[in-house]
C-alpha cells in the first residue's frame, strides 16, 4: 500500500510540471461544483437516471465521440441521459445541438455531470473538464470506474502513456484485432478493461462512395516541434517553423512540378490537412497549384475528407487505418523515420512496410511515382493488401457503436 502511494505521488508531481493557469481555474470550478454535484447525484438516484457524458477535444465533434453520441440518441428504448461536452464557440456546436443534449466544456455543469455520470466517454485521453484535475481524481477508487476510452485512432506504437498504470481507463476500446492483442499483452490492462469492439466512426465507412478526383495529404504531428503540452515529455523550441525539416519537406511536395502536373493532367484535387497540433503553422505553407487545397480544420471535416478521397498520403498517422478499413490505398511518406522513432513513438507491433496496408516511401520522387501508379490502376489495392486487410480487420461491419453500447451495459457496476 505504501509503495502504491509513493508511485501515485510521483506521477502527480510529474503532471504538476505541466500545470497552466487554466488548470488552476479548472480546480476552482471543480470546488464550486462539489455541492451542486452532491445535490444532483441525489436527484438522479431518486429519478433512477443514469448519465453518460461524452466528448472529444473540447472544440470538436468529428470523431468516435460524436458518432457514438449520435447512435445513443437514435435509440428509442435507451433510458440513459446522454450529454456531449463541447465549447460553445466550436464550429461543430450547432450540429451537436441538433443531435442531443449539450453542455459547455469546462463549465460548472460539465463538472457536475462528470462527477455524477455513470461513464465518462471520450476519444481523447484527457477528455475531462480539466485534464490535470481529472488525472488526480481518477486515481481515486471512487472515480476509477468511469473513464471509457473510445480512442482517436488505432494504437500502432509502444505508447507508454497508454499503459494501464498511467491511464487507469475502465475500458480501452480497440479498432483492430492485432491492436487488441498487442495492447492486451503489453499495456497491462485487466481482461475486462480492454475489448475489440471497433470504432463508432467505422459504422459509416462501408456505405461511403469514393470521390475519385480527390487525394488527401494528412501528415501527423511532431512532438519535437509541436507546442509543449500535457502529452509531451520531449520538447524542442522551434522559433522559426520554416527552418524545420517537416515544413521544408511538405512545402517541397506541395510545390513539386511533378506532382502539380500529375494533378492537372488527371483533373485531381489534393487536400493538405495536417494534424491539428500542426494546424497553427498552416499559414506558413503555400502552393502555386490551383489543384491543391491547404485545408483549415475549422472548415474541413476530417471524416468527410476520408470518406470522399480515393488515395491517402500520410507518414505515421493511424488515420491511415481508417482508409484501410475502407480498402483504399495509402502511401506512407516517412522522410524522418529514424528521428520519429527516437523522439516520439517507439516501434510497436505494426510494421508499415510488411503490413500490406500501404506502401512506404522515403523520397519525394518515390511518393509521387507510387501515387501515379495508384491513379493508373484505378485506386485499387493489390490482392496481397486485400488479404492482409481482412486479417487486420477481422470484424468489418456497421455494428461498432452497437457493440460498444452493449458492452458498456454489461460492465455496469463492475
What is the role of each PLM region?
Residues 79-83, 167-172, 269-270, 308-311, ...:
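Short active-site oxyanion
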Residues 4-13, 37, 268, 358, ...:
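C-terminal amphipathic helix plus adjacent low-complexity
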Residues 1-56, 232:
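Membrane-proximal basic amphipathic "stem/tether" segments
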Residues 285-287, 316-392:
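Catalytic binding pocket for nucleotide-activated donors in carbohydrate/polymer assembly enzymes
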Residues 104-112, 276-321:
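Donor nucleotide-activated moiety binding/catalytic core segment of transferases
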Residues 51-205:
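Active-site and donor-binding regions of nucleotide-sugar-utilizing enzymes
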Residues 133-153, 233-247, 328-339:
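A short, gly/pro- and small-residue-rich
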Residues 63-69, 200-284, 361:
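Conserved catalytic-core segment of nucleotide-activated headgroup transferases in glycan assembly
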Amino acid at each position: 500500500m505504501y509503495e502504491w502511494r509513493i508511485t501515485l505521488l510521483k506521477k502527480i508531481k510529474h503532471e504538476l510540471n505541466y500545470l497552466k493557469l487554466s488548470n488552476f481555474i479548472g480546480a476552482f470550478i471543480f470546488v464550486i461544483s462539489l455541492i451542486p454535484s452532491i445535490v444532483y447525484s441525489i436527484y438522479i438516484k431518486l429519478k433512477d437516471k443514469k448519465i453518460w457524458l461524452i466528448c472529444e477535444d473540447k472544440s470538436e465533434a468529428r470523431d468516435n465521440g460524436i458518432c457514438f453520441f449520435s447512435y445513443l440518441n437514435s435509440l428509442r428504448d435507451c433510458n440513459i441521459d446522454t450529454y456531449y461536452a463541447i465549447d460553445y464557440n466550436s464550429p461543430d456546436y450547432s450540429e451537436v445541438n441538433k443531435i442531443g443534449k449539450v453542455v459547455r466544456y469546462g463549465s460548472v455543469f460539465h463538472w457536475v455531470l462528470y462527477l455524477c455520470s455513470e461513464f465518462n466517454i471520450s476519444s481523447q485521453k484527457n477528455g475531462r473538464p480539466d485534464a490535470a484535475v481529472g488525472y488526480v481524481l481518477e486515481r481515486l477508487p471512487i472515480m476509477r470506474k468511469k473513464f471509457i476510452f473510445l480512442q482517436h485512432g488505432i494504437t500502432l506504437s509502444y505508447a507508454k502513456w497508454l499503459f494501464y498504470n498511467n491511464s487507469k481507463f475502465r475500458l480501452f476500446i480497440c479498432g483492430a484485432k492485432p491492436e487488441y492483442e498487442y495492447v492486451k499483452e503489453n499495456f497491462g490492462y485487466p481482461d475486462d478493461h480492454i475489448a475489440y469492439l471497433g470504432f463508432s466512426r467505422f459504422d459509416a465507412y462501408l456505405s461511403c462512395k469514393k470521390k475519385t478526383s480527390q487525394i488527401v495529404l494528412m501528415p501527423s504531428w511532431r512532438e519535437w516541434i509541436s507546442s509543449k503540452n500535457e502529452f509531451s515529455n520531449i520538447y524542442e523550441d522551434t522559433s522559426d517553423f520554416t527552418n524545420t525539416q517537416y515544413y521544408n519537406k511538405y512545402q517541397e511536395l506541395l510545390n513539386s512540378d511533378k506532382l502539380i502536373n500529375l494533378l492537372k493532367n488527371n483533373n485531381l484535387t489534393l487536400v493538405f490537412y495536417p494534424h491539428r497540433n500542426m494546424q497553427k503553422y498552416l499559414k506558413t505553407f503555400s502552393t502555386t497549384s490551383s489543384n491543391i487545397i491547404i485545408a483549415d480544420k475549422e472548415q474541413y471535416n476530417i471524416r468527410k475528407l476520408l470518406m470522399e478521397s480515393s488515395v491517402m498520403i500520410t507518414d505515421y498517422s493511424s488515420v491511415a487505418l481508417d482508409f484501410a478499413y475502407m480498402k483504399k490505398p495509402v502511401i506512407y511518406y516517412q522522410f524522418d523515420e529514424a528521428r520519429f522513432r527516437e523522439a516520439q513513438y517507439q516501434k510497436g507491433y505494426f510494421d508499415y512496410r510488411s503490413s500490406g496496408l500501404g506502401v512506404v516511401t522515403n523520397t519525394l520522387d518515390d511518393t509521387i511515382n507510387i501515387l501515379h501508379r495508384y491513379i493508373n490502376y484505378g485506386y485499387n489495392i493489390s490482392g496481397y493488401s486485400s488479404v492482409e486487410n481482412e486479417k487486420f480487420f477481422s470484424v468489418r461491419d456497421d455494428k461498432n457503436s452497437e457493440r460498444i453500447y452493449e458492452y458498456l451495459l454489461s460492465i455496469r457496476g463492475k
